[in-house]
């Protein structure tokens, strides 16, 4: 039997997909901008 692949971890989630990480790079800021334009309720983890 293999274990489930998704092992929730809030700290890892924030470090990998968080707002501060997105703001760090030009591409990340572009992602946030696109999500704001689209009207996403949540723009990052």
UniProtKB/Swiss-Prot annotation:
Highest taxon, organism lineage: Bacteria
Segments passing through the bilayer: none
Single GO term (MF): structural constituent of ribosome
GO biological process, one term: translation
GO CC annotations, alphabetized: ribonucleoprotein complex; ribosome
Keywords, in A-Z order: Ribonucleoprotein, Ribosomal protein
Signal sequence, start to end: none
Transferase among keywords: no
Family affiliation: Belongs to the bacterial ribosomal protein bL34 family.
PANTHER family: LARGE RIBOSOMAL SUBUNIT PROTEIN BL34M, MITOCHONDRIAL RIBOSOMAL PROTEIN 34 FAMILY MEMBER
Name of the protein in question: Large ribosomal subunit protein bL34
Species annotation: Kineococcus radiotolerans (strain ATCC BAA-149 / DSM 14245 / SRS30216)
Organism phylogeny: Bacteria, Bacillati, Actinomycetota, Actinomycetes, Kineosporiales
